[in-house]
């Protein structure tokens, strides 16, 4: 398996059913470690700054929950589901900064 890339979506089963997860860790880290950092995708809608709606060109319909951050072993990554658009990834970057209390321009 090639190293997963930031912005890619995989299905993972962490013991409560297979769910989609978006890789948010940087590509250099992804190449050199046995795990990745990811956030959950969900169909539940929340109108708070840490949730991002997927766009029409994204691989799934739903929302990214930037509050739900997990470290996933690469061996836990299941089916590849696609990659989010750069526009959606920019919104996710802002949501992650908000969730983690990081300064964002």
UniProtKB/Swiss-Prot annotation:
RNA cleavage is inhibited by the C-terminal domain of DNA topoisomerase I. GO terms for molecular function: DNA binding; enzyme inhibitor activity; RNA endonuclease activity. Disulfide bonds: none annotated. Signal peptide: none annotated. PANTHER family: ENDORIBONUCLEASE MAZF (PTHR33988:SF2), ENDORIBONUCLEASE MAZF-RELATED (PTHR33988). Belongs to the PemK/MazF family. Forms a complex with cognate antitoxin MazE4. Interacts with DNA topoisomerase I. This is Endoribonuclease MazF4.
